[in-house]
Amino acid sequence: MSLLTEVETHTRSGWECRCNDSSDPLVIAASIIGILHLILWIFDRLFFKCIYRRLKYGLKRGPSTEGVPESMREEYQQEKQSAVDVDDGHFVNIELE
């Protein structure tokens, strides 16, 4: 006997599922996890540029600027900002030595 005949039967009104155990806690938990996974996947696809740019550049702290002249600080900040402002999803990492 095939799995199709055990689960679904073709009737005049269409395909019907004979699943009487849909109140099983395992089925409910799997449904909730599936829905949450779908929601998180949609958010990831919608906001992936913001999320990954924040993770890659926002959490890193630059080197200490104590004792560095103000002009060099501004130059470093401009180079750091230009590395983050790259469009089209391409990231550039500038390492200053």
From Swiss-Prot:
The record marks 37 as: Essential for channel activity, possibly by being protonated during channel activation, and by forming the channel gate and the selective filter. The chain crosses the membrane at residues 23-43. Signal peptide: none annotated. Keywords: Disulfide bond, Glycoprotein, Host cell membrane, Host membrane, Host-virus interaction, Hydrogen ion transport, Inhibition of host autophagy by virus, Ion channel, Ion transport, Lipoprotein, Membrane, Palmitate, Phosphoprotein, Signal-anchor, Transmembrane, Transmembrane helix, Transport, Viral ion channel, Virion. It is a single-pass type III membrane protein. The record marks 41 as: Seems to be involved in pH gating. One of its GO terms (molecular function) is monoatomic ion channel activity. Residues 44-97 are intravirion. Residues 60-84 are annotated as: Disordered. The M2 protein from most influenza A strains is inhibited by amantadine and rimantadine, resulting in viral uncoating incapacity. Emergence of amantadine-resistant variants is usually rapid. One of its GO terms (cellular component) is membrane. Its main location: virion. Residues 1-22 are virion surface. The keyword Protein biosynthesis does not apply. The modification Phosphoserine is found at residues 64, 82. When the channel is activated, one or more imidazole moieties of His-37 probably become bi-protonated. Belongs to the influenza viruses matrix protein M2 family. Cytoplasmic tail plays an important role in virion assembly and morphogenesis. Forms a proton-selective ion channel that is necessary for the efficient release of the viral genome during virus entry. After attaching to the cell surface, the virion enters the cell by endocytosis. Acidification of the endosome triggers M2 ion channel activity. Homotetramer; composed of two disulfide-linked dimers held together by non-covalent interactions. May interact with matrix protein 1. This is Matrix protein 2. The gene is M.
